[in-house]
A protein has these predicted regions:
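Short, well-ordered beta-strand elements
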Residues: 1-9, 31-34, 52
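Detector for C-terminal structural segments
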Residues: 8-22, 38-163
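Short, well-structured beta-strand/strand-turn elements
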Residues: 25-40
């Protein structure tokens, strides 16, 4: 049976795993869904590469060089969390990653990223299934809470409570 792993605490990943299981069963493929605590998931998927499929939330942040490049660049094939655990390699994509990293012209960089996206969607080292919309909420008692693209991991160092 094909194994699909997901980390507890992210129920949307579990629901997606069950949908995948049902859809693959319909075409004769047996799937076992395995839910793991987050540390065990990271060990099994990223450190040990002991998985067939894994549901993993990827975020791109304000600059894709920071989060997308490590997930797909050949030089990031490592047994470590949140890098290229798929073992994906494409020399043309690597060249684009290397070039866009040093490109200062935003228009040229954007064109390079469109090209990278086209390659990744053709090669499918990871299959985007859904997007989790960011929801940010804070009590009106607080001021200067950063609500940016990174959501809950944004800095709160300047936040304060009005009394």
């Amino acid at each position: 049976a094909l194994r699909i792993h997901w980390a507890s605490g992210r129920d949307y990943e579990g629901r997606a795993a069950e949908i995948i299981k049902d859809n693959l069963r319909a075409v004769g493929i047996d799937v076992t869904v395995l839910v793991l605590d987050r540390p065990s998931f990271i060990d099994k998927v990223f450190r040990n590469w002991d998985f067939d499929l894994a549901n993993q939330l990827f975020t791109t942040g304000p600059d894709p060089s920071i989060s997308v490049t490590p997930r797909y660049h050949t030089n990031q094939i490592k047994k470590a969390p949140f890098v290229n655990g798929m073992g994906y390699t494409n020399p043309e994509v690597d060249k684009l990653f290397d070039a866009e990293f040093t490109e200062v012209d935003r228009t040229k960089r954007a064109a390079m990223w469109r090209n990278i996206q086209q390659h990744l969607m053709a090669d499918l080292p990871a299959l985007p299934l859904f997007e989790v919309p960011p929801i940010h909420a804070a009590s009106a008692k607080y001021r200067d809470i950063v609500m940016g693209s990174q959501g809950y991991i944004e800095s709160r160092e300047n936040a304060y409570m009005v009394r």
